[in-house]
A protein has these predicted regions:
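Glycine-rich, Arg-bearing micro-motifs that act as flexible, cationic patches
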Residues: 112-138
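Short, well-ordered secondary-structure micro-motifs
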Residues: 18, 45-48, 99-102, 125-127
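Short, flexible loop segments at boundaries between secondary-structure elements
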Residues: 142-150
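Residue-level recognition of beta-strand->loop/alpha-helix junctions
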Residues: 37, 91-93, 148
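Small/aliphatic-rich secondary-structure junction motif
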Residues: 1-56, 81-83, 88, 139
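Structural beta-alpha unit
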Residues: 75-113
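A short acidic, glycine-rich active-site loop
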Residues: 55-71
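Short, hinge-like loop/turn segments at secondary-structure boundaries
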Residues: 50-54, 106-108, 131-132
């Protein structure tokens, strides 16, 4: 049925739980996984001297994002290794995480996206899904399995 599962993560607790559940599903199906992380780009600065105290330079931002991506994707890699599931990881820079998830699923020919119901920003009271999950469901042309903690 499903042979290649894209598992996006933002590093939130629910996203990490979803990643582990996605790996378990992949093992049960005999599928491989691709862990995916989309990071926001650094805001360009014109003059370093004008950078407010506490703000990172673009290079510092890049290093922080790389460290965060390694940490977030490491959860998926560790779960996949323990389960004996083939795994690769991808990290991109994007202002639009849902679009990046859709593009990655298409580019890598994933036949399922397995993602958390919501990420870092959480849910509004009237929502069942987070905004990025909703966008992937609405705009992707592939199956999406949404993991929701009960």
């Amino acid at each position: 049925m499903f042979k290649h599962i894209l598992i996006p993560t933002d590093g939130s607790k629910l996203s990490s739980e979803a990643a582990e559940a996605g790996v378990r599903l992949a093992k049960a199906l005999g599928a491989r996984v691709t862990g995916f992380f989309a990071a926001p780009p650094a805001t360009p600065i014109v003059y370093k001297a004008l950078l407010p105290v506490g703000y990172a330079t673009p290079d510092e931002h890049r290093k922080m994002i790389e460290k965060t991506a390694r940490s977030c994707l490491g959860v998926i890699e560790k779960a996949a290794k323990a389960a004996g599931v083939p795994c690769e990881t991808v990290s991109v820079t994007s202002d639009f995480p849902a679009d990046a998830i859709i593009a990655a699923a298409k580019k890598r020919r994933c036949d399922l996206v397995f993602m958390a119901s919501h990420g870092r920003r959480g849910l509004r009271r009237s929502s069942l899904l987070g905004s990025e999950t909703q966008k992937v469901l609405s705009n992707g042309n592939f199956p999406v399995l949404v993991y929701r903690k009960m």
